[in-house]
Amino acid sequence: MASIYYCLGLYPIFADAAEIIVNASVPPARYSRTDTRAIFAMQLRIWPNGEPIKVFTLADDNPIHKDFVKNNLNMFPHQFRRAWDRMTYSGTGIAPIQLDSEQEMIEKVMTTPNAIGYVSRKPENAKIRLFDYQ
């Protein structure tokens, strides 16, 4: 069945996308896919309440990271890496904080105010909520 959807070009619509999670301190608002991409590309650095955004990611070769970038942001991991490297080497910005595991992602987002990250599915935790974007 998936091969039929893939051949029709519909597979990404039905693919399981990673869940974007935020610390409960992040102000609730509706964000666009462009805003979301800018946050993870480290181009949008401040939440609407004026607090700095803390971005957490997984390694480029992590399957959850690949799924997140492709299905949630409609990009490829190497495109993000290139943008982060360009900002880092030019001194105009920094790369997000890279974590080693999904469990570490959950812990960091849960304990870091204004944090954003992604996981394969939302954990049941009052200090974490899903990020609302269209």
Functional labels for PLM-detected ranges:
Residues 18-134:
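Exported/periplasmic ABC-transporter solute-binding proteins
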Residues 10-12:
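N-terminal signal peptide c-region/cleavage motif recognized by signal peptidases
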Residues 1-3:
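Sec-dependent N-terminal signal peptides
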